[in-house]
């Protein structure tokens, strides 16, 4: 690379395959003004960019970026799409991307709830084995045990609800 923030290496600038660079940028969802970053990088080695070739490649790359499958995959990573897709498909892609972000959020919440359930179950098992009863009376132990049972039940229900919601999204989008 030319510098720590250069978008292209010296060799990429000298090769000058602007259509291929544009395709890569389009497939990554980069906007039209991204070419200015390449201009800056390549001007340091005395190379001018070719806007027409780059934009032609970018438009082809956008066909890969602006798909329902890709919109959902981006959302499943917890990310929003860059607003570079044609206006006629943008609302649908934004909805699908939002569903992907919901999947991401539900998955994170499921992981948290599963960790919580494990913790409750370990506490409950210790109580049953009387390994670490730090309560002063048997009634306190029973009350604590009942509270844990209720937390386990509630957490299990939340986990089941999250799993159902995730399964519904998986059915809708096929994965």
Q: Model segments located where?
A:
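C-terminal motif of bacterial Sec signal peptides marking the signal peptidase cleavage site
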Residues: 2-4
């Amino acid at each position: 690379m030319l510098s720590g923030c250069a978008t292209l290496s010296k060799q990429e600038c000298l090769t000058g395959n602007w259509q291929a660079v544009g395709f890569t940028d389009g497939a990554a969802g980069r906007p039209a003004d991204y070419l200015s970053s390449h201009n800056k990088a390549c001007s340091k080695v005395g190379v001018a960019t070719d806007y027409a070739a780059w934009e032609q490649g970018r438009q082809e790359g956008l066909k890969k970026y602006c798909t329902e499958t890709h919109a959902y995959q981006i959302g499943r990573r917890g990310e929003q799409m860059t607003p570079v897709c044609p206006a006629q498909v943008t609302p649908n892609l934004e909805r699908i991307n939002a569903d992907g972000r919901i999947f991401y959020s539900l998955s994170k919440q499921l992981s948290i709830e599963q960790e919580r359930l494990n913790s409750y179950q370990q506490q409950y098992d210790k109580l049953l084995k009387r390994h670490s009863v730090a309560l002063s009376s048997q009634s306190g132990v029973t009350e604590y045990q009942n509270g844990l049972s209720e937390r386990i039940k509630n957490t299990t229900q939340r986990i089941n609800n999250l799993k159902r919601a995730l399964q519904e999204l998986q059915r809708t989008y096929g994965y």
